[in-house]
């Protein structure tokens, strides 16, 4: 069975197609990613998740490598699939769509990303209407007040402090990315939920958006000549053969770092929680379940809530930092001085 959501060209095309509404100015992004399935037999083996598999998880895990073992069940919960599962009520298959050789199927992660986008639309729509009804001398309350604090935090502590002049034009993207990632992270912690940010194709697509925004912003701020001059870092022409490859590699390591950071942190958290739960099944001990699995799982679960906010903040902060570094004239001059 497949152990990871591998990077696939078809998946990246699918994600890009589904997130185009964000670039066209809609109120919230719709991101998508899913595992491109291999042979039908292998896929069915990975997708099987029944009451029997749950009940015998400890016995299979004890065997070490049997189908339905603890490791297989854990990976099954983390990986994407073409079905929504609501144990013990059953499994509901999702439609498969293939266009021009590209798999654009609706998957579990796609459904939860649509749900996150819907939540964003409803919340921001409600807050927007709330502000329309508030008089100039009145203070907002409830959700509107909380959202105002969030917007001010992103504006002052993230966008303005890292981008500087012209930060306003990047606020919609940064605010949307923060809330979108946060909602996705939290949806992965609810019962029957799925963590789309644990899919490397999703985090890669988000990072690619940051990459292109960074490069376009840098070209607009410095011009083509200034942008290309950055690649040489003000060094003597004899060193260009060394500096240019280093600078080009540096351009791509930034989105790579964003991709792996978010993907690894969210995936690791879910693996730890599920592993702690399965300790009691593997050891077949109620004592372990009461004094180890349950309390430690609750602790990690609460920690994951904090990590959900933290990772959304880090991704947004680094995105703003990369945009600011690419747009700042003085940043290039400082590099040239070195």
Curated annotation (Swiss-Prot):
Subunit structure, interactors included: F-type ATPases have 2 components, CF(1) - the catalytic core - and CF(0) - the membrane proton channel. CF(1) has five subunits: alpha(3), beta(3), gamma(1), delta(1), epsilon(1). CF(0) has four main subunits: a, b, b' and c.
Gene Ontology molecular-function annotations: proton-transporting ATP synthase activity, rotational mechanism
Any one GO cellular component localisation term in the record: proton-transporting ATP synthase complex
Residue stretches spanning the membrane: 15-35, 109-129, 174-194, 199-219, 238-258, 262-282, 287-307, 308-328
Lineage: Bacteria, Pseudomonadati, Chlorobiota, Chlorobiia, Chlorobiales
Intrachain S-S bonds: none
Family per record: Belongs to the ATPase A chain family.
Coiled coil location: none
Basic and acidic residues compositional bias, start-end: 49-65
Membrane-topology descriptor: Multi-pass membrane protein
Annotated spans, Disordered: 45-66
Keywords on record: ATP synthesis, Cell inner membrane, Cell membrane, CF(0), Hydrogen ion transport, Ion transport, Membrane, Transmembrane, Transmembrane helix, Transport
Pfam families noted in UniProt: ATP-synt_A
Function: Key component of the proton channel; it plays a direct role in the translocation of protons across the membrane.
Protein name (record): ATP synthase subunit a
Compartment(s): Cell inner membrane
InterPro entries noted in UniProt: ATP_synth_F0_asu, ATP_synth_F0_asu_AS, ATP_synth_F0_asu_bact/mt, F0_ATP_A_sf
Superkingdom assignment: Bacteria
């Amino acid at each position: 069975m497949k152990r990871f959501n591998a990077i696939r060209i078809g998946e990246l095309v699918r994600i890009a197609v589904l997130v185009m509404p964000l670039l066209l100015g809609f109120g919230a992004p719709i991101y998508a990613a899913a595992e491109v399935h291999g042979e039908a037999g292998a896929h069915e083996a990975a997708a099987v998740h029944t009451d029997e598999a749950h009940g015998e998880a400890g016995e299979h895990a004890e065997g070490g490598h049997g189908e339905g073992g603890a490791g297989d069940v854990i990976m099954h919960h983390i990986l994407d699939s073409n079905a929504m599962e609501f144990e013990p009520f059953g499994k509901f298959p999702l439609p498969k769509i293939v266009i021009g050789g590209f798999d654009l199927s609706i998957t579990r992660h796609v459904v939860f990303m649509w749900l996150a986008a819907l939540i964003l639309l409803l919340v921001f729509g409600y807050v927007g209407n709330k502000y329309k009804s508030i008089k100039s001398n009145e203070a907002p309350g409830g959700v509107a007040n909380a959202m105002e604090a969030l917007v001010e935090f992103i504006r002052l502590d993230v966008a303005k402090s890292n981008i500087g002049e012209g930060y306003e034009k990047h606020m919609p993207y940064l605010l949307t990315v923060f809330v979108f990632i946060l909602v996705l992270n939290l949806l992965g912690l609810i019962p029957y939920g799925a963590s789309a940010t644990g899919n490397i194709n999703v985090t890669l697509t988000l990072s690619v958006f940051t990459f292109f925004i960074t490069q376009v912003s840098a070209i607009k701020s410095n011009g083509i000549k200034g942008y290309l001059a950055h690649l040489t870092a003000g060094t003597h022409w004899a060193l260009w053969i060394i500096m240019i490859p280093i600078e080009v590699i540096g351009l791509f390591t930034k989105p790579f770092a964003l991709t792996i950071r978010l993907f690894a942190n969210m995936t690791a958290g879910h693996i730890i929680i599920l592993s702690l739960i399965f300790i009691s099944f593997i050891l077949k001990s109620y004592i372990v379940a009461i004094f180890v699995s349950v309390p430690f799982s609750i602790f990690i679960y609460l920690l994951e809530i904090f990590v959900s906010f933290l990772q959304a903040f880090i991704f947004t902060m680094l995105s703003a930092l990369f945009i600011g570094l690419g747009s700042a004239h003085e940043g290039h001059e400082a590099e040239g001085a070195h």
